[in-house]
Amino acid sequence: MKGIIKRVCFGISSLALIPFVSAQQDAQYTQYMYNTMSINPGYAGRRDVLSIVGLHRSQWVGLEGAPRTQTLALHSPLGETGKVGLGFSAINDEIGPTKETYFDIDFSYRIKTSENGNLSFGLKAGGHLLDVDFDELNLFTSSDVRFEQNIDNKFSPNVGVGLYYYTPKFYLGLSAPNLLETDHFDEGNLNNSDGSSVIAEERINYYLMSGHTFTLSEDLLFKPAVLAKVVVGAPLQVDVSANFLLYERITLGAAYRWDAAVSGLAGFQVSDQLLIGFAYDWETTDLGNTQFNSGSYEVMLRFELFKKYNRMLTPRFF
């Protein structure tokens, strides 16, 4: 979940034993290769066209209160040289009684490092609204002071940075999309020394990503990729994927999220402007063996407007 892995049991009584709602990790995307700007502002404008991406993710389908995420992002190069990129993104993220809304502006500046190499510096700035309705929870006792007061649209600022290096066939990115660690408080409910108790925490997420495109034949491209996510106090998360692009139209692939899930991915380039993508995750944890979890899925649409004389003759695989 964007900015948060909350220790919330979805509507079950054991929630009353949890000391606070913890915020640790950003939203989880299987199709992150089409949604790169959300985790690295250096990607803004780097497709050299006006690119608009919409994505919906439903996680752990069948489990009440499970995470749901919607993302809308658009970005484009500016000016004749395209060195400057500008983007905007909005994210809605829900899990159990918690709803989060993010809105960010992304800025990037590109420099040439070689004939084919480019290095892009990115900056992200925006805000975050957190809403927690504890009335939706089923607790052993209604007198639990930790959950007496809801959090209503609590605002937090956000600043992030990113580096993105790329060539026509390779990319490498390093980023931290949220550099501001924030504690949300339920003031006065507990007798702490400062008169407040921590309800939610947002921690810095660090991302390292890389991929390479190999030409297997005139009509077949292969791209292995890896994404690593590091959060202090949370397990290391590593995603590895392998995708094939056939006839510049059809994408098929698979991914593995370390100790978490196996995924299947498919995409279809309907036209030069429109790409449709779908991903499905099978949990490899104990949660995946329950009758309440039917896996997770994502649906993605990407629409791009090309300049009249600057159309991409060969679709970029990233």
Locations of regions flagged by a protein language model:
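N-terminal secretory signal peptides that target proteins for export/translocation
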Residues: 1-6
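Bacterial N-terminal signal peptides
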Residues: 9-19
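Subset of outer-membrane beta-barrel
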Residues: 24-318
